[in-house]
Regions:
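Conserved donor sugar-nucleotide recognition element shared by glycan-biosynthetic enzymes
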Residues: 43-50, 73
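Alpha-helix C-terminal capping segments
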Residues: 42, 51-61
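Conserved N-terminal subdomain of the carbohydrate kinase-like
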Residues: 61-105
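Positively charged, low-complexity intrinsically disordered leader regions
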Residues: 1-34
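Short secondary-structure capping/turn segments at boundaries of alpha-helices and beta-strands
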Residues: 5-6, 50-52, 92
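Short pre-catalytic strand/loop immediately N-terminal to key active-site residues, enriched for Gly-Thr
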Residues: 35-44
């Protein structure tokens, strides 16, 4: 039987590593999605929100584990994650088939 070893913080690269989906949210502002022609874009997702919040509020070293289509939308979400101060060391990139049958953001 193996023994669980808990390392000290100075021996770890990250204080928290979140595993989950990161989504792109399109916000129409005051109008309705159906009639809007301009949107603000935001990143979000339960696990990612925790990682970003701990980074912003407490300065913890956080990272996210997720997978994205290797296209402009996926790279946009990656940029948002980096702007939030969360490490992207563990992101996985998947080939995009052009229509979202095999992978999508």
């Amino acid at each position: 039987m193996s023994v669980l070893e808990i390392k000290s913080a100075d021996q770890c690269r990250h204080d928290l590593v979140a595993l989950g989906e990161v989504m792109l949210r399109l916000d129409p502002g005051e109008g309705r999605v159906r009639t809007a022609r301009l949107f603000s874009a935001w990143e979000g997702g339960g696990e990612y929100n925790v990682a970003r919040g701990l980074r912003r509020c407490f300065g913890l070293r956080t990272a996210v584990v997720s997978a994205f289509a290797d296209n402009e939308v996926g790279r946009l979400v990656e940029d948002f994650i980096l702007q939030g101060g969360v490490a992207v060391d563990y992101l996985q990139w998947r080939d995009y088939d052009g229509i979202g049958r095999t992978v999508r953001n």
